[in-house]
Design a protein with these regions (language model features):
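N-terminal segments that mediate ammonia production and transfer
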Residues: 1-306
């Protein structure tokens, strides 16, 4: 399991999300509060869209297999960038020499020229049985851009393939439909191959102007009794959000200030503060969509029936 974080709203220094809170994303790499037996030590990645930067439609990109808590470059960058949108990820892998820890496997995934990025918390069990069947559903120009070994990068290519223009800027509804269509394809391939093992697919997908997130799992709770690591996956597919005016210090802690209409939203595997008040748990089998408009943040939660 990994930990994911997405933000959309008022300009906000990255350090407030990665470092400053008492359960920040960097802390979740080595001391996650909702993971008892698993750490996220296989690298960090982020995409950050800053409207004040040169070429604001192109996000700042950073990823490294070093631990983010020891990464001075990341710390300095986080203090300088104040994006209106951020997608970040700390990667967790099984403690095995079969795990491939490499920069090409770090999230968020972003093919050159594409406007959409994707980060994933979860794991498609028995993915090797599905991988080559996915080629039929992924556009050739996208399949040949896959560089890593993860199921997540294939999910990214599959989502892009459902868009009318995988290199264009999708409307929020089109992006949400593409994510749902990708999940339906994955379900069909699993059914065809008799795969019925618990496989979480929590996603954060963004173009920098909108955001789609899912809390979803195929065959939740079904796992081989001899697989102790798989059993520990079950509590880790959490997803939380805080929505309001802007995120900042208030008294002795950090909170999202209330505002109507809202202007900012944070979505994360775990609340960024030990005090969960002000945070809501994303319902299971649901999708969140958010979009920045002139009137504020349009935000919606909907059932995800695929």
């Amino acid at each position: 399991m990994c930990r994911i974080l997405a933000y959309l709203g008022e300009p906000l220094p990255v350090q407030h999300l990665l470092y400053d809170t008492d359960n920040s994303l960097v802390r979740q790499s080595y001391r996650p509060r909702m993971m008892n037996t698993f750490l996220n030590l296989a690298g960090f990645g982020m995409k950050a869209w800053d409207p004040a930067s040169l070429r604001p439609d192109d996000p700042f990109s950073y990823r490294a297999t070093t631990l983010p808590s020891f990464d001075r470059n990341l710390r300095f960058l986080a203090a300088k960038v104040a994006p209106t949108c951020l997608v970040a990820h700390v990667r967790g892998v099984t403690y095995s020499d079969e795990a491939v820890v490499a920069e090409t496997n770090l999230h968020p995934f972003h093919f050159p020229g594409a406007r959409v990025v994707l980060a994933h918390n979860g794991h498609l069990r028995e993915f090797r049985r599905m991988r080559y069947a996915l080629v039929e559903h992924v556009r050739p120009e996208l399949a040949q851009r896959i560089e890593g070994t993860t199921d997540s990068e294939w999910i990214y290519a599959l989502v892009l393939s459902q868009l009318d223009d995988p290199f264009g800027l999708p409307e929020t509804g089109e992006l949400a439909d593409a994510v749902a269509a990708a999940l339906r394809i994955l379900r069909a391939l699993r059914v065809e191959r008799g795969i019925a093992t618990s496989s979480p697919v929590n996603l954060c997908v963004s173009s920098g102007r909108n955001l789609v997130a899912t809390r979803f799992s195929f065959d939740y709770g079904w796992y081989p009794p001899e697989d102790e690591m798989l059993e520990t996956d079950l509590p880790y597919v959490s997803l939380w959000y805080a929505v309001g005016g802007e995120y900042g210090e208030a008294g002795d802690g950090w909170t999202m200030t209330g505002d109507d209409p809202p202007r900012s939203v944070i979505i994360a595997s775990e609340p960024l503060t030990v005090d969960h008040s002000g945070w809501l748990e994303v319902p299971e089998y649901s999708m969140l969509t958010a979009e920045l408009t002139a009137a504020g943040l349009e935000f919606e939660t909907r059932d995800l029936d695929v």
